[in-house]
Amino acid sequence: MLELNFSQTLGNHCLTINETLPANGITAIFGVSGAGKTSLINAISGLTRPQKGRIVLNGRVLNDAEKGICLTPEKRRVGYVFQDARLFPHYKVRGNLRYGMAKSMVDQFDKLVALLGIEPLLDRLPGSLSGGEKQRVAIGRALLTAPELLLLDEPLASLDIPRKRELLPYLQRLTREINIPMLYVSHSLDEILHLADRVMVLENGQVKAFGALEEVWGSSVMNPWLPKEQQSSILKVTVLEHHPHYAMTALALGDQHLWVNKLDEPLQAALRIRIQASDVSLVLQPPQQTSIRNVLRAKVVNSYDDNGQVEVELEVGGKTLWARISPWARDELVIKPGLWLYAQIKSVSITA
């Protein structure tokens, strides 16, 4: 568990945090440049020192301004991966990985190298590596110090799109197989969507929202970030069944289900899906003999006018689903809170 209750002033910027983060999964730190994202992880790592408050990691006090406690970075057991890999140019990859390696991680070296796909790189110098390869090595080096927490400061920001696509699967694999909590700084919605379990949104040094990805994603805090055509819902589902005759998989959503193209996943596997609001249409009665496979009973929570369109907030199985319709459709269907209807879903994207 990471307890953050501190304030810090750097120049004209003030950062104030009072949150407790669980010791598992990935928490994305999201916001515009200057929001306080890097300042937050620098304070946690010990690169800067808050003027007030405390930082406590798994019961160990890293910083207590009142008591004058401020552990040096090397004593905090916190790994840090920067935007630029910062590898030692005169060491080969193997030497970079072993630099600072904890004794407890010696037996894990080969496993971690395989997990990150860097075994073919061990005898190469950093100067011969691509940006994505350098970042994989930097992540491996940080993990081999046996940290209790891993901080990643926009590790994909300096990479072009092909290199980002190269690195994302390795990060996803790490989240599944390495039980180390991570704070992932980013201003990329795509990275957050594919990696994060939770999101903390910072604005001018203040926390505007903090919670599970699917909750924060559907909140008003995220509206300025989402292009109108990309308003969407994030839902947690589980694999219910694979169709015996068609290449389709059913995903459980409360007591209902969604059909998607067949997935290579076992039954009961947990997944996250994304549904664009523009791919959801509404009807008052269940349609007969329709080509749309996904028709879910839903309850209207509210509706909002938005630049000539209407965003309708629905509840399906205790989860939030958004639909975008025209004002004409809203008036004709008499959309209002409490109305039960049916949501027809044309397309579903699997995100994690």
From Swiss-Prot:
Descriptive protein name: Molybdenum import ATP-binding protein ModC
Gene3D superfamilies: 2.40.50.100, P-loop containing nucleotide triphosphate hydrolases
Binding site for ATP: G31, V32, S33, G34, A35, G36, K37, T38
Location, primary (coarse class): membrane
Record GO terms (molecular function): ABC-type molybdate transporter activity; ATP binding; ATP hydrolysis activity
Gene responsible for this protein: modC
Organism this protein belongs to: Shigella dysenteriae serotype 1 (strain Sd197)
Residue ranges of domain Mop in the record: 289-352
Enzyme class, spelled out: translocase
UniProt-listed PANTHER family: ABC TRANSPORTER I FAMILY MEMBER 10
UniProt keyword annotation of Glycosyltransferase present: no
Entry-linked NCBIfam families: modC_ABC, Mop, PRK11144.1
